[in-house]
Amino acid sequence: MSSKHKDLDKNKSMETLKRILDYIGQYRWGVIMSLILALITVALTLYVPILTGRAVDRIVGQGNVDFAGLTRILWKILGAVGLTAVSQWLMNHINNTITYRVVKDIRTRAFNHLETLPLSYIDAHPSGDIISRIIADIDQFSEGLLMGFTQLFTGVLTIGGTLLFMLSIHPAITLVVVVLTPVSLFVASFIAKKTFVMFRHQSETRGELTALTDEMLGNMKVVQAFGYQEETQKQFEEINSRLAGYSLRATFFSSITNPSTRFVNSMVYAAVGITGAYAVIRGFMTVGQLTSFLSYANQYTKPFNEISGVVTELQNALASAARVFELIDEKAILDDKPDAAVLTHVEGKVELVNVDFSYTPDRKLIENFDLNVDPGQRVAIVGPTGCGKTTIINLLMRFYDVDSGSIKVEGTDIRNITRKSLRTNYGMVLQETWLKTGTIRENIAYGRPDASEEEIIRAAKEAHAHGFIMRMPEGYDTVISEDGGNLSQGQKQLLCIARVMLCLPPMLILDEATSSIDTRTEIRVQKAFARMMEGRTSFIVAHRLSTIREADVILVMRDGHIVEKGRHEELLERGGFYAEIYNSQFARG
């Protein structure tokens, strides 16, 4: 890897760490309490070797064993060990609390921010990758953060405390320990740089794998119908192999951390034992002091092993957190203007003035588009796939902003209207049905949670959904599984229609609204729609021209332009593009 990329990774890692510390800073009192408990835990832990050394000297240094003094020391050791256990338990509890609250804060922030992102981001990123960032990556981050809290505080304090005690016993031998121990730090630092890159690739590839799995599960019927299983398996195998490769390399580097540092620390321990034995023989220290010193040397080197493991886990945590912060840093939809108007008393006057729009800068989709819709008019938009029909709907709802020109409702540019008030004045039934996990009643009342039972049933009857609902096991209390898996496509669309029937806003958008309903049901729904559209401005997008014959005006689109405009009969008489589309559907019959 080039030095430039290394610097970028290092800067990204440091920036991510700083942001994590900002989140942790919200719980500073918990951190302070954890530090105090860590200090108590370390102090008590370091007190035990002193007592052990004194006990050894009581046995070795005198002709007769002082059993009374030895008993007092043993009671002190027992008390210190007991208090250490209690303080360590409290510290771990506080650390767990801080960790999971920080994780909750970041996950909530990521989810809330996700709902503010423009549809362009959602359309451009696989849903599986987004889910992986909010779920899997944050879980990985929490594991590393928890280990950091649990071991980092006590590790640093233990190193400082043991160093002071060793200096008080024998400065020269302490120098041996201090000189040799940094070798393990060098080893851990070298490995940490390698593991961060591998863990980052691992997280990114895990997101790819989640995205592919999510895509396959959501379209299993299509995959099987076209015999695409083998190709899907190849894609899965390729991504899975890359994930295994990154995981193995990350594990390889992380797995050699502890053995390497333990080897160095064992060398330190051996050096202390040899020099300490020589000091005892020469009378520079007692056997009890050597016992204490060996214990301190072990305690001094042990945190380096733990910290090296913590550093490895933190690299994984930082790599995962970086992906989450990338999502959080995505540019949100611009807030409504401070003086944005709330849309009220809507009659349904809509104007599109010289509108230009493109999803990508190099391909203009809508160009010089003009449309004037009077209140209560039913406007049908037809044309071949990709001509811009659904894009017009996206612009009307302000899911996307126009590149140039303007869209007005009641004479006001929709960019000067709050998004919420604009969208609540539209009722929308889309080709892609969406139902939340919950009861049928909850789904119908999605736009009006306060609706009464009578209103919900009336809306279902108007949408011709009441009959099949009553045949369900629990009627309106039947729980719909994920994405309506226990309903047919037609039933799901009828429920979406009932949802709009309940709200009855002044403007309607029907995008391929009856594409998944059988002909008999479609006739009933069309009658219900006709009643619903009376006095309401309605935009109907459909490929099946039989659904738009009664429209007040039909816009025929081609390559982002209106090429024809008029009523059904007028357009047929002209014999133009509309007549060509119509005849292609019905002439064969």
Regions found by a protein language model. Name each.
Residues 15-16, 24, 56, 91, ...:
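Juxtamembrane loop-to-helix connectors within ABC transporter transmembrane domains
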Residues 329, 336-337, 343-589:
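ABC-type nucleotide-binding domain
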Residues 228, 252, 269, 299-327:
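Cytosolic ends of transmembrane helices, especially the final helix of ABC transmembrane type-1 domains
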Residues 26, 30-43, 54, 80, ...:
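Transmembrane helices of ABC transporter permease
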Residues 119-120, 136-145, 149, 157, ...:
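An intracellular "coupling" helix at the cytosolic face of ABC transporter transmembrane type-1 domains
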